UniProtKB/Swiss-Prot annotation:
Protein name: Peptidoglycan deacetylase
Function description: Catalyzes the N-deacetylation of peptidoglycan (PG), an important mechanism that appears to confer lysozyme resistance and to mitigate host immune detection; this likely contributes to pathogen persistence in the host. The exact nature of the residue in PG that is deacetylated has not been determined. Is also able to catalyze the deacetylation of acetylated xylan, and, to a lesser extent, that of chitin and chitosan. Therefore, this enzyme might play a role during infection, considering that xylan-containing carbohydrate structures are among those commonly consumed by humans.
Coiled coil: none
The protein's enzyme class: hydrolase
Annotated organism of origin: Helicobacter pylori (strain G27)
Reactions catalysed: Deacetylation of xylans and xylo-oligosaccharides
EC number: 3.5.1.-, 3.1.1.72
Name of the gene encoding the protein in the UniProt record: pgdA
Sample GO molecular function, one term: hydrolase activity, acting on carbon-nitrogen (but not peptide) bonds
Self-association state and partner proteins as the record states: Homotetramer.
PROSITE patterns attached to this UniProt entry: NODB
NodB homology domain mapped to chain residues: 29-276
Organism superkingdom: Bacteria
Pfam families according to UniProt: Polysacc_deac_1 (PF01522)
Length: 293
C-alpha cells in the first residue's frame, strides 16, 4: 500500500501574549522583550525557512500578537499561509468563566477575519489546556478542527463532548471515587492531535518561573527525537499525520533553525510524504472518515 504521510508545521506565535498569559513574565520588561523578539525577529526568520523549502504552514496566532505585530502578520498572509485562533493573551481556558472564554474566542475570530478576510477554521488552546466547555464553544462558532487534545498521536479523530470522570476526594469513602471514565458523545469537530514530544518550547525555552523549565537542551537531541518519531511512523503506518508545533520564540534561534533544516531534509527523502496546512489535514480526514448521520 502506498504511503500517505501528511506533514505539517503549526506555528504558535505566543510572543508577548505568552508572557502575559502563561509564562509568568507579565511584570518583567526583560521577558516582554523576549516576546518582542519572537514577533519582530522570529516570524521573518521562520517565513524565510518555509520559503526556502516551499512549505505551507499554519500559524496559530493570539489576538494580542495580531494587534501588536501588524507588519509581520501581513507577511504571513502575503506568503499564503493559514491562520488559526490561539486565544488573545494566551489565557488559560480553565481559569476563565464561560463568558470570558467565549468573549476571547469571538475577539480572536474577529481579528483573524480582519487580517485574512475569512474566519479561521482551526483552533489551538493556549498551553494546550481545554476547559469543560471549549469543545462546545468551538462547535457553536463554526470551527472545523482543533489541535489541542491527545487521545491519539498520529491519527486524527472526532472530538467528543461530555466526557466525565471522578476526582479523588479523600474526605469521602473510597467507593465514591472508584468509578471509570464515562465517554461522551462524538461531534463533527475534527481533532488533529497535539503532542508535547513534538513541541519545541518545553525543552528549548528558558522560563524563569517554570519549575521544570529547561531551555538549554541541545537541538541535536530534540531533532533526533523528532526524526526517530517520524521514522517509526513511516515504518509502521501507511496513513498518518505528523504535525510539529513550533514557536518563533524558540525555533527562530539559529541553532534550532539548523535543526529544522535537518528534519525537513530528512523527511523529504521519503516517498508518499506531503507537506500540508492543518486545514488540509482536516479536509482530508473528513473525506476519509465521513461521520454517520
Amino acid at each position: 500500500m502506498a504511503k500517505e504521510i501528511l506533514v505539517a508545521y503549526g506555528v504558535d506565535i505566543d510572543a508577548v501574549a505568552g508572557w502575559l498569559g502563561s509564562y509568568g513574565g507579565e511584570d518583567s520588561p526583560d521577558d516582554i522583550s523576549r516576546g518582542l523578539f519572537a514577533g519582530e525577529v522570529g516570524i521573518p526568520r521562520l517565513l524565510k525557512l518555509f520559503k526556502k523549502y516551499h512549505l505551507p504552514a499554519t500559524w496559530f496566532v493570539p489576538g494580542h500578537s495580531i494587534e501588536t505585530f501588524p507588519e509581520q502578520m501581513k507577511m504571513i498572509v502575503d506568503a499564503g499561509h493559514e491562520v488559526g485562533a490561539h486565544g488573545y493573551s494566551h489565557e488559560n481556558p480553565i481559569a476563565m468563566s464561560t463568558k470570558q472564554e467565549e468573549d476571547v474566542l469571538l475577539k480572536s475570530v474577529e481579528l483573524i477575519k480582519d487580517l485574512t478576510g475569512k474566519a479561521p477554521t482551526g483552533y489551538v488552546a493556549p498551553w494546550w489546556e481545554f476547559s469543560n466547555i471549549t469543545n462546545e464553544l468551538l462547535l457553536k462558532h463554526g470551527f472545523k478542527y482543533d489541535h489541542s487534545l491527545m487521545h491519539n498521536d498520529f491519527t486524527p479523530y472526532y472530538v467528543r463532548v461530555g466526557d466525565s470522570w471522578s476526582k479523588i476526594d479523600y474526605s469521602l469513602e473510597a467507593k465514591d471515587w472508584m468509578k471509570p471514565l464515562i465517554r461522551g458523545v462524538e461531534t463533527n469537530l475534527v481533532e488533529i492531535p497535539a503532542n508535547w514530544y513534538l513541541d519545541d518550547l518545553p525543552p528549548m525555552m528558558f522560563i524563569k518561573k517554570s519549575p521544570n523549565s529547561f531551555g538549554f537542551v541541545s537541538p541535536r537531541d530534540i531533532g533526533q527525537m523528532w526524526i526517530d518519531q517520524f521514522d517509526w511512523v513511516y515504518r509502521e503506518m501507511d496513513y498518518a499525520v505528523f504535525s510539529m508545533t513550533i514557536h518563533p520564540d524558540v525555533s527562530a534561534r539559529p541553532q534550532v533553525l539548523l535543526m529544522h533544516e535537518k528534519i525537513i531534509e530528512h523527511i523529504n527523502k521519503h516517498e508518499g510524504v506531503r507537506w500540508v496546512t492543518f486545514n488540509e489535514i482536516a479536509d482530508d480526514f473528513l473525506k476519509r472518515n465521513p461521520r454517520k448521520k
